[in-house]
Amino acid sequence: MEKRNPREWLCLNRTVRFGETDAAGVVHFVELFRWCHETWEESLEKFGIVLKEIFPSTQINTSQLDVALPVVHCEANYFQPLYVGDTINIELYPEKINESSFVLLFKFKKNGEQIGTTNIKHVSINPITREKCALSKQINLWLHESGLNF
């Protein structure tokens, strides 16, 4: 199997849109968390994971999923404001905590300068019993491969 560079699925770029700003013309704080989730989803897709096998949808009954991955903690730090048209780089650094949880660390950069960070902790649970369970094979592989030579 060909060795892939994790940067292919862990570093993404985006441009700030008008609808993501508040009345002061600055990105609204909640957008960072939305961008984090979108970055994570895109990362999983680029890695080769089919999203509907990980996240519930109207096409799949939640009881058909092996695990659910709820957020149990999140926090953000903002160092500079962002405005419409700003281009930013989002770097994702996943870290496995134990057999049932992981944290997604995000660094937001503009022109090479770090302008914000977030971390979001997920726990793997059985979607029916809501009890902690082991992470799926797909997520474990993504976490393992994401930690190699970044």
UniProtKB/Swiss-Prot annotation:
The keyword Hydrolase is assigned to this record: yes
Keywords: Hydrolase
EC number(s) on file: 3.1.2.28
EC class name: hydrolase
Keyword Hydrolase tagged: yes
Top-rank taxon: Bacteria
Catalytic activity: 1,4-dihydroxy-2-naphthoyl-CoA + H2O = 1,4-dihydroxy-2-naphthoate + CoA + H(+)
Similarity-based family: Belongs to the 4-hydroxybenzoyl-CoA thioesterase family. DHNA-CoA hydrolase subfamily.
Name of the protein this chain belongs to: 1,4-dihydroxy-2-naphthoyl-CoA hydrolase
UniProt organism field: Prochlorococcus marinus (strain NATL1A)
